[in-house]
Curated annotation (Swiss-Prot):
<feature type="binding site">
    <location>
        <position position="332"/>
    </location>
    <ligand>
        <name>[CaMn4O5] cluster</name>
    </ligand>
</feature>
<feature type="transmembrane region" description="Helical">
    <location>
        <begin position="142"/>
        <end position="156"/>
    </location>
</feature>
<feature type="binding site">
    <location>
        <position position="170"/>
    </location>
    <ligand>
        <name>[CaMn4O5] cluster</name>
    </ligand>
</feature>
<keyword id="KW-1133">Transmembrane helix</keyword>
<feature type="binding site" description="axial binding residue">
    <location>
        <position position="198"/>
    </location>
    <ligand>
        <name>chlorophyll a PD1</name>
    </ligand>
</feature>
<feature type="binding site">
    <location>
        <begin position="264"/>
        <end position="265"/>
    </location>
    <ligand>
        <name>a quinone</name>
    </ligand>
</feature>
<feature type="propeptide">
    <location>
        <begin position="345"/>
        <end position="353"/>
    </location>
</feature>
<keyword id="KW-0793">Thylakoid</keyword>
<feature type="binding site">
    <location>
        <position position="333"/>
    </location>
    <ligand>
        <name>[CaMn4O5] cluster</name>
    </ligand>
</feature>
<keyword id="KW-0464">Manganese</keyword>
<protein>
    <recommendedName>
        <fullName>Photosystem II protein D1</fullName>
        <ecNumber>1.10.3.9</ecNumber>
    </recommendedName>
</protein>
<dbReference type="InterPro" id="IPR005867">
    <property type="entry name" value="PSII_D1"/>
</dbReference>
<dbReference type="InterPro" id="IPR055266">
    <property type="entry name" value="D1/D2"/>
</dbReference>
<keyword id="KW-0408">Iron</keyword>
<keyword id="KW-0157">Chromophore</keyword>
<dbReference type="GO" id="GO:0009535">
    <property type="term" value="C:chloroplast thylakoid membrane"/>
</dbReference>
<dbReference type="GO" id="GO:0045156">
    <property type="term" value="F:electron transporter, transferring electrons within the cyclic electron transport pathway of photosynthesis activity"/>
</dbReference>
Length: 353
């Protein structure tokens, strides 16, 4: 009898725990994806803070001297970074307990793999948590679908690109100057500015910002006043009210007169669908572009592609970009290039003015 009561009590305890985890009445929804998520960003964040302050230098290139990235080794907030794993390690996941010594692990591996893997697991599980909460509330799943865009971008940069290049040393350093260094080297090696998927991503991000600003300003400018002139317009509304707070017909009429009639939406659902789809699809394409360039399917190269009737090259901005790419690549891998052959053997044509 005692055993049966203990079993029932433990079962009810587990049941109460399950109900608490999946309850939508909590101030912050946890969910089963949240149970999986919580440890990973905590590990990534805590290791990042410790490493940013005190991590020893990492032998990132496999040649030359180790690169320090932490504050205690002479960097500041702008120049500090978590240095990627050494090129000597390749794509191996090298836990600290497999290293011959802790110093050797710091020298060749460092905390980069640990932080990046836990970060990617954390953001993916956060996306799952968004879907789970939507499911519990009977909502449609598009919030998680929209969040998949930055998840795809982070996965492309931190995982797909190193896999395509063959080692984690090509991953993006976790810091301000490290991010810009990654961008410059990426342009030098893959000509990303001339890749159509990157162009779609730029249109998505900047276009999304423009449309968001336009929508917000139109809504704020066409509020339905429920108060007198002596009171704030905000006092006439309450959170969750049934009635609309702004007049979409007025906003549609204003924008239609500002540009032309069919440039504005007269349907709120269509408008918000457009506002969601535009940046999300753009960022999806950027992530896809990073993933293709990871395997060296690079941007367009129009090097010396314009010639006159006698076959002489007419230099264009594309040739200027290629020269800049070569210069950036030499600065990045100065031991691997004595001088780029493309520049060394190029014929220089002087034109008398």
């Amino acid at each position: 009898m005692t055993a049966i009561l203990e079993k029932r009590e433990s079962a009810s305890l587990w049941g109460r725990f399950c109900d608490w985890i999946t309850s939508t009445e909590n101030r912050l929804y946890i969910g089963w994806f949240g149970v999986l998520m919580i440890p990973t960003p905590l590990v990534a964040t805590s290791v990042f803070i410790i490493a940013f302050i005190a991590a020893p230098p990492v032998y990132i290139d496999g040649i030359r001297e180790p690169v320090p990235g932490s504050l205690l080794y002479g960097n500041n907030i702008r120049y500090g970074a978590i240095i990627p794993t050494s090129a000597a390690i390749g794509l191996h996941l090298y836990p600290i307990w497999e290293a011959a010594s802790v110093d050797g692990w710091h020298y060749y591996v460092g905390p980069y793999e640990l932080i990046v893997m836990h970060l990617l697991l954390g953001v993916a599980r956060y996306m799952g948590r968004e879907w789970e909460l939507s499911f519990r509330l009977g909502m449609r799943p598009w919030i998680a679908v929209a969040y998949s865009a930055p998840v795809a971008a982070a996965t492309a940069v931190f995982l797909i690109y190193p896999i395509g290049q063959g080692n984690f040393s090509d991953g993006m350093p976790l810091g301000i100057s490290g991010t810009f260094n990654f961008m410059i080297v990426f342009q030098a090696e893959h000509n990303i500015l001339m890749h159509p998927f990157h162009m779609l991503g730029v249109a998505g991000v900047f276009g999304g910002s423009l449309f968001s600003a336009m929508h917000g300003s139109l809504v704020t400018s066409s509020l339905i006043r429920e108060t007198t002139e002596n009171e704030s317009a905000n006092a006439g509304y309450k959170f969750g009210q049934e009635g609309e707070t702004y007049n979409i017909v007025a906003a549609h009429g204003y924008f239609g007169r500002l540009i032309f009639q069919y440039a504005s939406f007269n349907n709120s659902r269509s408008l918000h669908f457009f506002l969601a789809v535009w940046p999300v699809v753009g960022i999806w394409f950027t992530a896809l572009g990073i993933s293709t360039m990871a395997f060296n399917l690079n941007g367009f190269n129009f090097n010396q592609s314009v010639v006159d009737g006698q076959g002489r090259v007419i230099n264009t901005w594309a040739d200027i970009i290629n020269r800049a790419n070569l210069g950036m690549e030499v600065m990045h891998e100065r031991n691997a290039h004595n001088f780029p052959l493309d520049l060394a053997v190029a014929e220089v044509t002087f034109i008398d003015g």
